[in-house]
Amino acid sequence: FVSIYAPEDLISVLNARTFIFENQFNKALAQGLLAGVSENSGLLLRPVKKSEVQVLRNKKLRFEQEILYHKVLDLVGDLSLFVQELPMAKIRIHNGGHIVHHQIFKRLVKYVHSRYPA
């Protein structure tokens, strides 16, 4: 659970590193999609249990919820591609990702247009 009410609440979100799961990494590597990627580019993860992961290559999370915070950073970044200013909103996401973020944006646009017709 993450709440962002003020700019200072974004500090942890902005410090969250990107990540990739080991199976996705190996597939992308085999396809030649990781040119320029180094061990410092982000976190390499291996699923352990349903909601647990192991961080590989002797790295540690900067803080307990770093993976969750990176997902929030992805959401804010994806929505910011479409608008300069985000409205106050309460957004709940389970298993989010870039496709889900685009769906949220479409719903936000529909809502704004219904409330404030041109």
Q: Model-predicted segments: where are they?
A:
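Short acidic-hydrophobic catalytic motif
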Residues: 1-118
